[in-house]
Design a protein with these regions (language model features):
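N-terminal Rossmann-like NAD(P)+-binding domain of SDR-like oxidoreductases, especially those catalyzing
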Residues: 1-176, 230, 298-299, 329, ...
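Amphipathic alpha-helical recognition patches that constitute DNA-binding helices
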Residues: 11, 144, 172, 189, ...
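C-terminal substrate-binding subdomain of Rossmann-fold SDR/epimerase-dehydratase oxidoreductases
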Residues: 199-202, 206-339
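Short histidine/acidic/glycine/proline-rich micro-motifs that form metal-
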Residues: 146, 177-182, 212-213, 242
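Short aromatic-enriched loop/helix-cap "lid" or pocket-rim segments at secondary-structure transitions
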Residues: 39-42, 130-132, 181-186, 219, ...
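Hydrophobic alpha-helix immediately C-terminal to the catalytic Tyr-X-X-X-Lys motif of short-chain
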Residues: 152, 156, 160, 190, ...
Length: 339
């Protein structure tokens, strides 16, 4: 079985590649390294660094060259621009990568007989929901650029299924955590950020009171479902959630306990949440304070009953166990990174 993984040098893509390699699948790995890191490609039992092709998913000739032999069975499209402020700052780039990149894969998949495309989507599309837990069919159109790119990508995926009879499953990830989560980027995911600050002995700054709640999913549990959906036909959209959530304060206290470090966090004004992106606060129409307030303080909890019923999937990794694994891997990485 031959599988193309895009975004293979990223957090999720690299972990997926490692699992499928251990399963004996033949892999074609691509990444343009805009967010991926070579460090993600080394595992105790295998080094993928020389196997990853430096390629953008928008590269029409490049993608065609990988697929025109007709021997790629499945595509996992994990590539994309995910950080919310990056998408707000460069919306045309976000749309081009997250939407046009997928369409490039779908079109080549259509032409060259791919059995299935599994698309990385997001539960950020539920940002305007008010009833929880959120099911796949509970939906209000999102506000921010990133979830809108994923919403539109799902519509194009469904169009290809309805028009050509292709099969695409969109996995709506909750907040994914685990080894290789990117702690080095400009605006790291919360879990990676708090571990990094604790490791360096710095005071973490939370732009809230710490009581907002998010649902999380451990990367290995996500991969279990990504494999389970591979044989389903037609279009599908599936929540990938642990069916529970945690507050910022609960997560931070757990990280303190695991790392044996205790640093009092600072709670700051949510208006400065994206202060590392000053351009968003400039111009005739700066970003609205209420939008930042909503993004920071929103409540998220997705219902995973559909994934359990249709695919027999159940998340297995507890938050303590998963966070411990993440901390172990991140600390090892940070030993070689200047503070």
């Amino acid at each position: 079985m031959k599988i193309l993984i895009t975004g293979a040098a990223g957090f999720i893509g690299s972990q997926l590649a490692h699992r499928l390699w251990k399963n004996g699948d033949v892999l074609v790995l691509i990444d343009n390294f805009s967010f991926g890191h070579e460090d993600n490609l080394t595992f105790e039992d295998h080094d993928f660094r020389k196997e990853v092709i430096r390629m953008d998913i928008r590269d029409k000739d490049g993608i065609k060259s990988l697929m025109e032999k007709g021997d790629v069975d499945y595509i996992y499209n994990i590539a994309g621009i995910a950080p919310l402020p990056d998408c707000q700052l460069n919306p045309t780039e976000a749309i081009d990568v997250n939407l046009n990149g997928l369409v490039n894969l779908l079109e080549n998949g259509r032409r060259y007989g791919v059995k299935k495309v599994i698309q990385a989507s997001t539960n950020a599309m539920y940002e305007n929901e008010t009833e929880f837990p959120t099911r796949e069919d509970d939906f209000k159109v999102p506000t921010l650029i990133y979830p809108n790119t994923k919403y539109c990508a799902e519509r194009f995926a469904q169009s290809y299924c309805d028009t050509y009879g292709m099969s695409v499953t969109c996995l709506r990830f909750a907040n994914v955590y685990g080894p290789h989560v990117d702690c080095l980027r400009k605006q790291p995911p919360f879990v990676a950020y708090m571990v990094r600050e604790l490791y360096y002995g710095r005071t973490p700054v939370f732009h809230s009171n710490g009581e907002q709640r998010r649902d999380y999913i451990y990367v290995d549990d996500l991969i279990d479902l990504a494999i389970a959906v591979r044989e389903s036909k037609g279009f599908d959209a599936v929540n990938v959630s642990s069916n529970t959530n945690y507050s910022v304060n609960e997560m931070y206290q757990l990280a303190e306990d695991i790392m044996g470090k205790h640093i009092k966090a600072e709670y700051a004004d949510d208006a400065h949440y994206w202060e590392r992106y000053p351009e968003l606060y400039e111009g005739s129409y700066p970003i609205k304070k209420e939008i930042l307030n909503h993004e920071i303080n929103k409540y998220s909890l997705c219902d995973n009953a559909y994934a359990q019923k249709k695919y027999g999937w159940q998340p297995k990794v507890s938050m303590r166990e998963g966070l411990s694994r993440l901390i172990e891997a991140e600390v090892e990485l940070l030993k070689n990174v200047k503070a």
